[in-house]
């Protein structure tokens, strides 16, 4: 590796060394070998930049590629430290800056075209730079970094120093640019914000000043946001306290309070995408929403440009969403995702849109060349176009990017001229190896995965994702053709490789099949068969040497479950194409094992790559988890099964990440690549590295693949993610190494050339026949359409994979063999189908319960099992869903029950009346926690202590007051007792001051603080705790009353139930149809019923498991047996009772109503047939019936009376309960009212506490903000002090330079005093003469094209101007310009003096410009200091106002007052907002006063009405009189006007002219033209005035500098005057006026003389000093130290 300090990190050209020297332990055979970069192919993923007018550059991988637009020649600059990060160019200085992407990245500055490193910029950035930007003027470079710093830094790239930097946390910038007109302004934009940065300089100090741009809303309107820090529009609320900003309400006290916005107040803004600068230092900004903005960078005013006319967009096209903008004269060019470049012509605040160019894909970048003759256009794919203005063919395609990422590369045999590249989208390109130019392309229109070129024929094979292998004819590299395609399987093709002699093509798929195909196109790429291996094949390695008759194949695939890798080794005989297919593969295309001789090996660790050595049966493997390369020796003996290989040799790879190992064409080199991006070439025997080259980096995930040509002279390396292809060549290669590879490649190339020639002839003939067939097909398609079905059939046949075709052929063969047996099975199936059909018909006729499903008749056991499994899965899924739903509902039930039932000490329930619709609810209550009880006891103890302290204080005061009067001790004791009673009374406040009726419920309010005394936070919190205790006690007291009423209702219901038993008996005895009224508790009265589910509430039948059904059946049968036995016993008892006693054990009184006297049997006969005895018996029977009826009536009346009595008692008891519950309801309403009153007090106190917290938050924020501003004030004061000191020092240097310049001017004649006077005058004229510095004139067309015109120069240009000035001085110093008669030595002395004078003047000019800049810097720092000071004063005023409001809030308390019934508040409460003078008085007094006032007011109104009528009549008469006078005046005036009527010429013209409107229109047109001319003249005058104002501004600045100088001089004069005044004051007035005047006169004369003498001496001294200096300079070389 190069050790040059200028090239320690970056290699500066394509021919620079890209490799390191061999290790010390390597063989001397390979010493001195190294690789270098030949060329690099990559397409831009970042923006392309111009380095000069004819060269562009862009980064690609580890390289920066430069392209000359005229010659198309490429130059490469390599970054050894890894992938190139961001890049920028500076056209005036022709330098390139780019960063790397390592930890703590570095920025490199390179000059072009020498590509030498000028500087290396090291900052404090940890991760990555995201943006770089050069200023057009000056040596400034801006860099921006992302996470974690978000830092903008300004560099002096020539001095490698950071001038200033500033961090912006969270600001992710997408574009950064300098103002092209000056380096003082920058613009940073992201998708959500824009900011303008101003760089201010004071000598060597630089300072950033940031200003954010307020973007419009998404609809292009502007939002006026109020000041959230110090709002001035907040409403005033005199009742509820001060209204504070939202940040204080949110409780924010830090920096977040400054930018806090509620979610509802945040509106979506426009999203900038790109911006560009104008010559007037304005900004054009494009937005995602399609709007175009113009921003004035001085005022930050945003203008939304409007379309002058609607631009028609294509159908379905989106809005013009510019991805990039570039400025041109009178407008901009913009491009978007639609691939169209639009030209915007902007005038004032409107623009017109025109289509400039159209492309297929989105255009991502536009940039003009420095001369603005060319426009560079870059697409999203990486293609680059150059549009040359004024050319015949303006659009030129410079870079044609590939369609997708490069997947693979392969040399076209022998690998000395061309190679192929394959992209992921299926694009195959033929590229020249000499200059990397693309010769041809072919699109396969499918996703491709692998590529390989055949060594034995001019063909290539491409593997695709859909399982195809396409064969390409590359005999003619300018027009490749697809000649064959093989659909192997539906699995994607992963690896395609040829053996070294090009006999076989091996294709590996993802599913683990390796297909063996004949590589010769003359054999139509015959597929020999496939062999099965493991999935995810990593690599297929082959060994095919000329001396061998077999091709050895090694396949590597992983065993992830075992953490190992498996190797499969098999051989393919060279004579395989001549063998009959049945001998090497079976019917399904699988290669036979006895032909391939397959062996399995395993290694104990995972390998990412493995290759097979040419000799010694060696395997070389690259370990994936450890950095080692191992070699394994395959045993000579045959084996079966899997053999574990042990490492034979192990070498540390010194490469990190998984890699791939390759074998050179002669088999002596091992080439390894890895994720680190380093290519290592090793000796096969020692496995030591002798060449190491870093072409890619780990940031781009290293190298994907590499290829070496047959002669070993060229190596292609393809990156994985950086899309960069690098061609390496040998920079130094030993003669022995070259001879080795030449000796191997020559016979191989000779052998292959014979096969290539024969196959080329076949391909050429097949190409001609294919062309003829295509022509015939084209003609036939015009006439015949009947063959389309046959072509589609062929295509359909081709869509079947080869492996499936083989499978189908094998199946067809098996079908032919087993066809008789098949027919028998089909016959049996048909008979079985008929039987099943009959069974299904019978099934349709049975009942629904007995009917079977159609699935039950399916005889397919697998199908039945599948359906059964599906049903089981569905049932299990439903069961799981139901269980989860039930579990969720159960969990929710438990939560609700725990929260609303279990946690309640008093459950909520209702109580209803029996007869009236009154419902009384109790108060549900939770048990107070231990913490609440402790707080309550603490507060109560504190309040009791305070009361006791108050009593003791009063006692102490009273004792002290009565110590002087000892005689009245007894009276004092009585007074003390009265005071105690008074204290006890005053502790309980009256209800109207207490604010509630809580005392009516027995609440103890003696501990409550008066509402007029609640000031401190602690008192308010204690008051809340006490009020909550009062509410709790009120609820508890009411609940006790409710519980008593509830128990009473239970008793009443029980009593009614007892009485209803007797009532039911009476009703049944009386056989009445009345219903018994039975009161019951409802669900609201018994809420616990909701937690219990009764059986009658369940509508679904309960599911009983089979094992439970048997158990239930046993229990039911046992119960039925017992019931039958009990019924049998009861039946026997009943029959015995009926037989013995007629069914009655005891005759009761209730039985009278049911008693019936049986009729004698003779009553069935007629009366005439009765006997006397029978008649007597009938009389006795009638008597008994009469007596029974009388007894029955008496008993019925007694029952009715008893029934009425019971009903009345029930009605009375329930009515009494209803009355009691009615009173309880009123009590409930009152209790709720009292609770609401107490809760209202609590809410008021909580509101006051919340407002107090808001005030404290606001105060804390203001204090923090004040501290922040004070720190800013300190910093600005320090900056002012430092700037002032620097200005004073610099001004002193400037004054010294000015003084030296004046001395040089004044001492000129004395310098040349020894020559003649006229010669001195001539020389002085020449001394004042200055050369004209000719500016480099640009061409007129270039000046007209460049929109920015001539821009101010940089420091480099200033140095060039000085050099040019000195060069012009050489012309003036020519001897030909010497006056006649002048000594040449004098002329030389004159020239040196004049040159010194010119240099000094240039220095003075530079110093004056720097002095003006420093003065401006100081003025801006003072302005910033004034702004900060104003903000500090504002904060102080806000703090004072806030403290006043806080005090006012603490004093003005919200008091809750009870009003009597009938007293209401005023609706318009704003009538009286100040209650400082208000008092509470009795309502009756006010009503009496109002009645008196009302009576007196009525009397006054009556008298006023009477006087009003009189005044109204007087006013009416006066009004009529005035009206008549005015009408008279109007008539007189009208008569006079008629007499003096003026009839002008215009009126005459109007009457005489028939087309008066046309005349007026002509006059209006003339006036409009006049107005337009006046308007143009006015605009010109305005422009002239603006120019004049600019000149006056510059003149004013000059005058300011002069005034500043004069003010400094005036300050010195004032000091001198003050000193003289002090001296005069010390002398005093001791002498007389005459003497004093005389002395003054003498002193003035002496002073005048002394001044004259001092001036003369000063002039002489200055002359002598100049002479001494001249002599010293003249004789300095000859001076000898004493």
From Swiss-Prot:
Keyword check for Coiled coil, yes or no: yes
Q: Which organism is it from?
A: Mus musculus
Checking InterPro entries in the record gives:
Quino_amine_DH_bsu (IPR011044), WD40/YVTN_repeat-like_dom_sf (IPR015943), WD40_repeat_dom_sf (IPR036322), WD40_rpt (IPR001680)
Coiled coil ranges (UniProt) are 926-960, 1171-1223
Q: Which residues form the signal peptide?
A: none
Q: What does this protein do?
A: Flagellar protein involved in sperm flagellum axoneme organization and function. Involved in the regulation of the beating frequency of motile cilia on the epithelial cells of the respiratory tract.
Q: Where in the cell is it found?
A: Cell projection, Cilium, Flagellum; Cytoplasm, Cytoskeleton, Flagellum axoneme; Cytoplasm, Cytoskeleton, Cilium axoneme
- Looking at the record, which segments are called Disordered? 767-790
Null allele outcome, as annotated, is: Mice are viable and show no malformations. However, homozygous males exhibit complete male sterility due to severe defects in sperm mobility. Sperm from mutant mice exhibits teratozoospermia characterized by short, thick, and coiled flagella and sperm axonemal defects. Females are fertile and give litters of normal size. Mice display early onset hydrocephalus and severe mucus accumulation in the nasal cavity.
The Gene Ontology biological process annotation of the record reads: brain development; cell morphogenesis; cerebrospinal fluid circulation; cilium organization; epithelial cilium movement involved in extracellular fluid movement; establishment of localization in cell; flagellated sperm motility; motile cilium assembly
Q: Which GO terms describe its cellular component?
A: 9+2 motile cilium; axoneme; extracellular region
This protein is called Cilia- and flagella-associated protein 43
Lineage from the top down? Eukaryota, Metazoa, Chordata, Craniata, Vertebrata
Q: Does the keyword Cytoplasm apply?
A: yes
Family assignment? Belongs to the CFAP43 family.
Q: Which domain of life is it from?
A: Eukaryota
Q: Which UniProt keywords apply?
A: Cell projection, Cilium, Coiled coil, Cytoplasm, Cytoskeleton, Differentiation, Flagellum, Repeat, Spermatogenesis, WD repeat
WD repeat copies, ranges: 168-207, 262-305, 315-354, 358-397, 488-527, 697-738
Major location category of this protein: other
What does UniProt note about where in the body, tissue by tissue, this protein is expressed?
Answer: Expressed in testis. Expressed in the lung, brain, oviduct and nasal cavity.
